[in-house]
């Protein structure tokens, strides 16, 4: 998938789910299920409930996403 096809939205992690997945509430009030990106796992960046994150989504499935950045 090319970079132009990816949609990015900021959101807040509301709930931790099993298997390193999270429920994220986006700024447009939608709730999605997201997992951490590989680079975040590799660098051991922790994501906790209440963290502000950047979520990457594909236009084909707007219910799932990938957490690519955790804001400080």
Curated annotation (Swiss-Prot):
InterPro entries in the record: NA-bd_OB-fold, RNA-binding_domain_S1_IF1, TIF_IF1
Pfam family membership, one: eIF-1a
Keywords: Cytoplasm, Initiation factor, Protein biosynthesis, RNA-binding, rRNA-binding
Cellular component annotations (GO), alphabetically ordered: cytosol
Origin: domain of life: Bacteria
Any one Gene Ontology molecular-function term assigned to this protein's record: translation initiation factor activity
Domain S1-like, first and last residues per copy: 1-72
Zinc listed as a keyword: no
Compartments where located: Cytoplasm
Main location: cytoplasm
Quaternary structure annotation from Swiss-Prot or TrEMBL: Component of the 30S ribosomal translation pre-initiation complex which assembles on the 30S ribosome in the order IF-2 and IF-3, IF-1 and N-formylmethionyl-tRNA(fMet); mRNA recruitment can occur at any time during PIC assembly.
Function: One of the essential components for the initiation of protein synthesis. Stabilizes the binding of IF-2 and IF-3 on the 30S subunit to which N-formylmethionyl-tRNA(fMet) subsequently binds. Helps modulate mRNA selection, yielding the 30S pre-initiation complex (PIC). Upon addition of the 50S ribosomal subunit IF-1, IF-2 and IF-3 are released leaving the mature 70S translation initiation complex.
UniProt-listed NCBIfam families: infA
Entry-linked HAMAP family: IF_1
Family: Belongs to the IF-1 family.
PANTHER family, A to Z: TRANSLATION INITIATION FACTOR IF-1, CHLOROPLASTIC
Protein name: Translation initiation factor IF-1
Natural source organism: Agrobacterium fabrum (strain C58 / ATCC 33970) (Agrobacterium tumefaciens (strain C58))
Lineage, opening ranks: Bacteria, Pseudomonadati, Pseudomonadota, Alphaproteobacteria, Hyphomicrobiales
Gene: infA
